[in-house]
Amino acid sequence: MRRRLRAVVRLLRAVGHGLHGMAIVLLAFPRLDAAARQERIRWWSIKMLRVLGIALASEGAAASGPCLLAVNHVSWLDIMAVHGVVPEARFVSKADVKRWPLVSRLVDSAGTLYLERERKRDALRVVHVVAAALRAGQVVAVFPEGTTSTGHGLLPFHANLLQAAIATATPVQPIALRFSDTAHAVSEAVEFVGATSLLRSLWTSACGDGVSVRLVFLPPRATAGADRRELAGALRCDIAAALGIDVA
């Protein structure tokens, strides 16, 4: 009973913080410069994790200048974890997110790029959009697995979006992400796989005990002249090694 009550309190606070974020987006963002917006994004992301009982830690440093970040994907919380450290990152996300209440407006404000996965040719469009962002000196983040996993392993990495980095000779920095809690080295509380709904995942996340998320920023890989499939395999091996996962 006590655990459920704590989860309810966390969820109520999360809703309040989400509404606060919406107010910032609607009222403050129009008059803030890019740096000030990024600081708001960092603050909001860290606090939302904290409200849900999740501690954020990072190791290593994000590369300076334009970069494509390649992150393993576990939960809808991954974006907040990365934004807590790299608030300037623009994520490539599935278009389904635009249908999520409240969340859609918030991720829009962070410059999210949307991919219609059902349309085969949309990937090519997004590659061009990402390449343009990288040429403009921006930081873009992608989930090469294309969907979430349980965190116990890594799914195959898709190479399509890496072409944007190769075409612009922009480095790709792998980031190893892991959620853990007091009972598990790989937390089950934040799982968002299969038929799990966003509401169900939100509830189990709020019920978690001592959940933390750790990001390990690994050395960037050069892309000039690279083969995108070989690059995808190398990035997967980098992240697997950092997480202690065997992908042989």
Name each region found by the language model.
Residues 1-57, 105-110, 208:
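A transmembrane-helix-recognition feature enriched in membrane-embedded lipid enzymes
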Residues 20-31, 50-51, 64-120:
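Catalytic core of membrane glycerolipid acyltransferases/transacylases, capturing the structured
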Residues 51-61, 77, 112, 156-167, ...:
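Soluble, non-transmembrane catalytic domains of enzymes that act on hydrophobic metabolites at membranes
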Residues 66-68, 139-143, 171, 214:
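Residue-level preference for the first positions of well-ordered beta-strands
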Residues 102-105, 152-226, 234:
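A cross-family acyltransferase "interaction/gating" segment
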Residues 113-134, 237:
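A membrane-cytosol interface segment of integral membrane proteins
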Residues 123, 130-162, 166:
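Soluble extracytoplasmic domains of inner/organellar membrane proteins
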